Amino acid sequence: MAPFPDEVDLFTGPHWRMKQLVGRYCEKLSNTNFSNNNDLLALLQSLYETFKEFKMHEQIENEYIIGLLQQRSHTVYNVHSDNKLSEMLVLFEKGMKNVKNEYKQLNYVQQLKERLEAFTSDFLPHMKEEEEVFQPMLMEYFTYDEMKDIKKKVIAQHCSQKDTTELLRGLSLWNKAEELQKVLKYSVDEKAERNSKTQKSSSSISSLPPEVMLNIFTYLNPQDLCRCSQVNTEWAQLAKTGSLWRHLYPVLWARGDWYSGSHAYLDNEPDEDWISRRKDESRAYQEWDEDADIDESEETGEEEDSSISMAQREKELLNSLVHYILPYVGHSVKTLVLAYSSATSSKVIRQMLEYCPNLEHLDLTQTDISDSAFNGWHFGACQTLHHIDLSGCDKITDLTLEKLSVALGIPSAHKKRLLKCYRNNRTLKDIRNQMRCSSLAQITGESTIYSDAFWANSDRSQDYTSPPIWILDSGNPGDIEDAADWKFRTTDGLCVLEMAPSVTCFSNGCCSRARPGRWTNVGWQEHCKAATVSYCGHTLCGNTLRTIHTLPEASALCNIGTRTLHSDITDCFPGSAKSDQQAARALQFLSLSGCHQITDHGLRALTIGGGLPKLEHLNLSGCLNVTGSGLQDLVATCPSLNDEHFYYCDNISGPHGATASGCQNLQCGFRMCCRSGE
């Protein structure tokens, strides 16, 4: 146990003195000629003085330490009731006063030796108990300043019982108490080794500057870093530097693979053998964990024991990460891979995600987690997340996607919802309070978007109050009278316009029906054919259907920036120094393969707050409860989606049916598929 600070350590100094006295009388006992009455008398006088000091020490402890502790803790009692100091003093007095014949003297000497041996065997453990049990209790029940005051009184009382020489000697001993305690605790070899480490020389590694040591630490794996942190305080601080813990792979580490580099260099497709072993480990561990009353004498197979042991090792490693490492380095973690974990749980994942707000790559493939794993995700909690793999997490539901959408935040283009607060002269504090909502629909004002009636309505644009944006050919922008009410900028031969609020035809009539970006070309044309539109006469309105065919690639539209009438409203989001357009909703990879409880509701939750403008990879294989309508609504807000990396069930008639890659779970033995068993 580590020593306590010297100024509040109540036992080490006095106990060192007591141990020194024990050593002295043991030495005298072995060197005394008991057949010589003078030698025996000198020994008894020395023992009498020694035990009087023991008695004085006991009284000081009772009055200034144990007595105070008993006032605050009722669990402390009878501490010094059985040390037999008084009986020993009576024994010494009897030996000094009575004149004995030779026979009685031999019996007395034998009794003296036995009683001293018994006392010594009890007294030394008693002092150790006080140091290891009562000192921590005192630190718990008394403040630091109270402990310092008690220490001063204890020292003063011990010194008051000695003459000037003893006083000076005692002060010197107590000042060196901590080092002397170490001398008693460790062997001669350990002491020599410790002293050699503390002696600094010009060639010692401890003389290197921290920058050089940190550079050396970058070549160490996580296991070596943990060992280095136990060397001394300086190394412990360096080992907790965030840059050394950017990539975490606990599942690999628990199995002896201490890789800690970028995930790009890992094989993302483990073989079936590896997956099968992880499944066996998980199953064996769950069966063992569920039966807490299992008979230890019951024989289990060697392979099952190995699986349980491996899962237990993984669980211990995860707990150590959560309690001892992530609180210090969590903000620097970019990669967290727990794919095929045997022992992880929703609670552990939730704690890890709370400590790691700047994650970019999260892989929870085939883990036994539920929606509660993401309870810690508040608004904007993972704006930097680029990659999330939830393949095989068959317990998650639409609630997880709602939380993910909330945590991804809102890009600057969608913060126009705050203009309502701005126009009502609401304070910045009111806006910030709204940002703390757990529902992105509440933050953006799109609370009706979770309603099935909303998505069943063909004219969805009427429920969105932000000014519409129109895209048309810059070679024919429209009438000059109309252009007076427009604000536009040219990008790649296109005009991107936003209409001023004064143009009322954009809040009702034909103009309000056009919502490029929420409708595909085909969907928009079908809607216009079916809707009864009373045209207002604007050239722009008449050109809408014509110019919709000239839209550029989705990636070009994503990079076009527009400014509204109040676009320089104060940014109320954390990290406002950097562009939200770049920071928020940066997700590029989303895999929900085998998550069969996901429905259209969850997919549509991802469309709120700006959709997923940078999403390139979307895997919905085995999501049996989604429909073509839900897929269409999500894809419409994912302009960067690559058809080659777009997977969904072959039985669903959805978007990009001719070019999408279909279902990946066909003939898969461990993930949901509607054709399982074929």
Swiss-Prot record:
Q: Which domain of life is it from?
A: Eukaryota
Q: Which UniProt keywords apply?
A: Cytoplasm, Iron, Iron-sulfur, Leucine-rich repeat, Metal-binding, Nucleus, Repeat, Ubl conjugation, Ubl conjugation pathway
Q: Where are the LRR repeats?
A: 314-340, 341-366, 367-392, 393-420, 566-594, 595-622, 623-648, 655-678
Q: Which cofactor does it need?
A: [2Fe-2S] cluster
Any single GO CC term annotated in Swiss-Prot or TrEMBL for this entry: SCF ubiquitin ligase complex
Q: Where is this region: Hemerythrin-like?
A: 1-159
Q: Name one GO molecular function term.
A: iron ion binding
One of this protein's GO BP terms?
intracellular iron ion homeostasis
The name of this protein is F-box/LRR-repeat protein 5
What species does this protein belong to? Xenopus laevis (African clawed frog)
In the UniProt record, the gene name given for this protein reads fbxl5
